[in-house]
Amino acid sequence: MLSFATLRGRISTVDAAKAAPPPSPLAPIDLTDHSQVAGVMNLAARIGDILLSSGTSNSDTKVQVRAVTSAYGLYYTHVDITLNTITIFTNIGVERKMPVNVFHVVGKLDTNFSKLSEVDRLIRSIQAGATPPEVAEKILDELEQSPASYGFPVALLGWAMMGGAVAVLLGGGWQVSLIAFITAFTIIATTSFLGKKGLPTFFQNVVGGFIATLPASIAYSLALQFGLEIKPSQIIASGIVVLLAGLTLVQSLQDGITGAPVTASARFFETLLFTGGIVAGVGLGIQLSEILHVMLPAMESAAAPNYSSTFARIIAGGVTAAAFAVGCYAEWSSVIIAGLTALMGSAFYYLFVVYLGPVSAAAIAATAVGFTGGLLARRFLIPPLIVAIAGITPMLPGLAIYRGMYATLNDQTLMGFTNIAVALATASSLAAGVVLGEWIARRLRRPPRFNPYRAFTKANEFSFQEEAEQNQRRQRKRPKTNQRFGNKR
């Protein structure tokens, strides 16, 4: 007999968690044992830690944490998440309810998509009833300690390839692409080294923005001496996009839209702060270039869109997303799907909506990316977050940020703030569009809700009214018992 998922198409883990109950009401743990219940809740919190630190939204993490606890018989749990903390609460016992709480601190953001895919498969296995708690705990221990699916050198090459592809995306030739490749390689290698030494992310972004600027100005001066023509703005913008790609703007807007304003505000402020570090680093690089008399050329006005290099830009868009996925340690199936999604999104952007302006075009194209990527991710059982973030990476406004910073430092304040505002609006449009597209894909592929175990949830709730009614019933039984014994006498 064909299953519902086979008839309708494959669904994502979070869709299955929202729609389907655990396979059986028989709990694999002793629900009256405080330690076993707390162990299951701690297991669910650790899974939520990996989801949150990988960039999963607040609401989706709650659903999947609750799915894990329900699969082990804890149908009544409250899950509260605020940015870097997870709190889970439940009651155990029959007549005497005993509260159980688990509090877990979430680690910092770590874009390791291989762990996200592994924990996604673990949740599916738990929800299907195929993994008991002790096996799930062992798998989770191995997952937390195991390295990525491939080493850091491969990821570093992915980031470097992404920088070169973004340069082509911005209209640069092979010389510009090669310099952007080397610049991105240097940025990620340096910031990763500083991160291991404990330097805060803000200062890492300052260093990254500085590295993105100074080599471009030196390369421009050398190119003039040899009679070559390059645009340093394309090199700098590609470095900015590499730094912007790992930020959490998409997740912050998704949290705000789905009803988690505290987490959304914190993530949005964090994104603005880290973006400010990039801008500060670019500004330092521009000023140092002037001090060293390695002058950058005046900014040209933004060129009107044309079809002369559309094919190259579409290909570069797909390569950018695939390279970003490699840089985030995604599995190869995820890399391929992310590249195909960005390829279709770039084609849609440059062939149909580029003339609508940067903000509107970004919003429409991101919606198409979120929708297409959401369907493909569900078809191939990949977390939709990976495809969504990678799919909009080619459209990040690195060039607008550089234009704004350059104009501001050259006494063109109005033009500078205008470009910064356009960059912020474009980034917000990308995030909002991809969230909307993924929501549409979820609505099309989501199975109907089915929850036959509501009575279990009701049974675990403590009610003063029920307690009072039980006491009244006990008191009514006592005199009847005494009277019956009196008649026997």
From Swiss-Prot:
Residue spans crossing the bilayer: 151-171, 174-194, 206-226, 233-253, 268-288, 314-334, 335-355, 356-376, 381-401, 420-440
GO molecular function: transmembrane transporter activity
Family of the protein in this entry: Belongs to the ThrE exporter (TC 2.A.79) family.
NCBIfam families linked: ThrSerExpThrE
Protein name: Threonine/serine exporter
Top-level taxon of origin: Bacteria
Gene (name only): thrE
Task performed by this protein: Catalyzes the export of L-threonine and L-serine from the cell to the extracellular environment. Export is dependent on the proton motive force.
